[in-house]
Amino acid sequence: MSRVRKSIRFITLFTLALPLFAQTAKRRFTIDDIYDRAKRIPAAAMEPRTFTWADDTHFYFPRTGAAGEVTSFVLVDAVTGAQTALFDPDELEAQVSKVEGVSTDEAKKFSRPRSITADWGARDVLLSIHDDLFIYRIASKSLTRLTSTPGKEEEATFSPDGRLVAFVRDNNLYTIDIVSKAERQRTTDGTKKIMNGLFDWVYQEEIYGRGIFKSYWWSPDSRSIAYLQIDDTHVPEFTVVDHLPVHQKLEVTPYPKSGDPNPAATLHVADLSTGNSIRLDRIADPAAMLIVDVAWRPDSSAVAFQVQDREQTYLDLDEVSRSGGDIHPVLHETTKAWVDNEGSPFYLKDKSFLWLSEHTGWKHIYRVEADGKQRPLTMGQWEVRKLFGIDEKNDWVYYSAAERDPIGLDVYRMHLDGSGKQLLTERAGTHEATFNAALTRFVDNWSDVATPPQISIVDAAGKPGKMIRDSNSGHELEQFDINKPELVHVPTRDGFVMEAEIIRPPNFDPTKKYPIYEHTYSGPHAPQVRNAWGGSTYLFHQMLAQNGVVVWICDNRTASGKGAQSAWPLYKNFGELELRDLEDGLAWISSQPGIDGSRALLNGWSFGGFMTTYALTHSTKWSAGIAGGPVTDWHDYDSVYTERYMLTPEHNKDGYVRTSPTQAAANLQAHLLLLHGAIDDNVHVQNTVQFVYALQKAGKQFEMMLYPKSRHGVTDPDLVKQLHTLAFGFVMRNLKP
């Protein structure tokens, strides 16, 4: 009798507890949760990363929809935190629909651009509609046509005083008065191969930044425009083929591969009052040099420009008057290997300036006097990441640095003599700051390895203001069975301390044996272990862990971001040192309880794809690999990036052979999945085709998937979902967790 009562009591208690279990049960991620355009959770979507100050108290950012498309721009009052629409897309659409020749679908697209160019105060916005320029005046909700020509107007910007708009048409530089609509052509020698005010492919990709094609700079007084002329006459062309149309679409682009003739860049200035344009530099052989930075002095009296040799073994900072004349050499930098361009000088009223340099092996801030004498304002075995600006009136310099943690990022300020340093961001993690022009406040985009971004306003003294956005305010991640990443330090065989991250499966049992999925990039100054939110990649890693795989990320020294001194050892020899460090990292994680090092898969894209193919043809430590968009022979990649680290093939013939996965294809022992965008204009699919042919000739088996309409990154949401479904299946088949 008593046994029956006990059983009934247990059943009753268990039944009562069921709702509690139902509420607290955690579930696994699915591919749809992360990559399906309609079903993915908000934490998997791209967060706004671009914040633009309209004035010193307002900024705006793009708001995106479920598929990542921009739906509107949000204007934020930095004092009150109030958010409103910068403009109503529907109202703009109504105006655009009145433009002759614009369809209903086009009106919707043109009124919701991915990015905008606005004047100071964000009163007027420039729009490109059917390759002509229009101004949308936000206050009056009126749309005004500026140009009406067969040619396409590109890279349009407002002058600092807001009176003019500059743009490039048919590779010539123009200006137009926004009131009178009077147009002036500022250059006349533009051709298909000679570009005024526009970068070619390699200059935007490797020197000024991916997606930055504008190669002109307004003087602060709006009276002149400095610009680069890029001459691609002798640069070999590469053809990218789109195979989807019945008749192939050919895209021909000047693309200098390592050792090829480079673009010839020259510096000019257009005087808007006289209409004259003169050349400023005195470079004897422009194709042998690179102009890597251009900036105006604040008083518009002179242009500062930085020049490097093509192998980037040195850097010269020079100045020249806006009216031309003699070149004034300011400083000359060299290092033990290559010299990275660290941006423009920040000028003070006494003609001195602040300058970022890593010539000691660590990037720090220097004050450079007019005579070229330098003294450091920051010192130590840590890196300054960015110099935001100088508040000379209040004696403050604002910058970001990885001083507290090499995998984090903080914002600091100090006095102009280097004293009085203050940490402005107390919370550990990564703080990406966007300052207003007055340096009185900044947008703080904070996250850590387990927390999605939180966007807030912080004043110049570090006092937190309004929270603008909390990406996990709905606590959506709490429904998932997530194991917080563990950040660890791993010694190499020669004592370098590598940063690493482990994500173990939930309910990890050290008496069992779990396989390893290792993610890498490995390229110079490109750490993957960061105390920052990893977005959809992080959620995919959690999904792997939930399915019984240990996720392992270990930054080899050259990728660590721990100063140039940690990257220089790879000079002239991609792959060898990186592989040694990755092997040391794999040995360390394999020695931990519950880890089966015999089942290890290496994954990477771009340089990470190179590293995966290199590792799998030069080592037997990994049983499988996924290589996306890989460089498989450095003869095939662009001159500026490759020669910075490897020199030219003429100067490093053996190095190019030694570092080629294609040359070593016969050594492949692991299971390999190759992925590549079919119209990749960066790392050409030629790399994968050459590697595939070498594998076939050697009798090697492998798997491959091409992505039509995809460039170096696969961005079509449907293809992204297919790619990760494929990758997940490959991991499960080969690691057998």
Enumerate the predicted regions with their spans.
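N-terminal secretory signal peptides that target proteins for export/translocation
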Residues: 1-6
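Hydrophobic alpha-helical segments, principally membrane-spanning helices and signal/leader peptides
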Residues: 8, 40, 204-206, 645, ...
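Intrinsically disordered, low-complexity peptide-like regions
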Residues: 9, 362, 415, 527-529, ...
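Bacterial N-terminal signal peptides
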Residues: 9-19
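Beta-propeller folds
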Residues: 22-435, 440-453, 457-460, 477
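Serine-hydrolase catalytic core recognition
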Residues: 236-238, 292, 300, 306, ...
